[in-house]
Amino acid sequence: MSVDTSSFGRAIASARKALQLSQKDLAKKILKEEDGEPITPQYLNDIEHDRRSPSSDHIVKQFAMVLKISPDVLYWLAGRVPGDLLTRQNVSSRQIDQAFMAFRRALKEK
């Protein structure tokens, strides 16, 4: 499935449409971590129109799972760093710099 990667919201909307899900149907499948309740269709609409961003890593992972999109792609589009990378211990500034340089090189090869 090809997903519009111009923004987080557009990626969510294009993947949802490719799976033939309504906003209401998708919203029911995305459960908030705090209370296990689904997000509202209005919140989803705001996300799809880039008026709001996902509120947590949990929401990003839920979208990835339901819409069959790589979580890393969604983190990138949301402008977020996955929580598991933020909590890594003993990572030097040199390692971080090298990782970002490799990432930038890979994007240029496109």
Task: Set out the residue ranges of the language-model regions.
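A short, Lys/Arg-rich alpha-helix, primarily the initiator
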Residues: 1-21
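Short alpha-helical DNA-recognition segment
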Residues: 20-46
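DNA major-groove recognition helix of helix-turn-helix
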Residues: 30, 48, 59, 78
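The DNA-recognition helices of helix-turn-helix-type DNA-binding domains
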Residues: 33-34, 51, 77-82
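Short, basic-rich loop-to-helix N-cap that marks the start of a DNA-contacting helix
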Residues: 38, 49-65
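Interfacial/linker helices and their anchor residues that mediate assembly or domain coupling
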Residues: 78-110
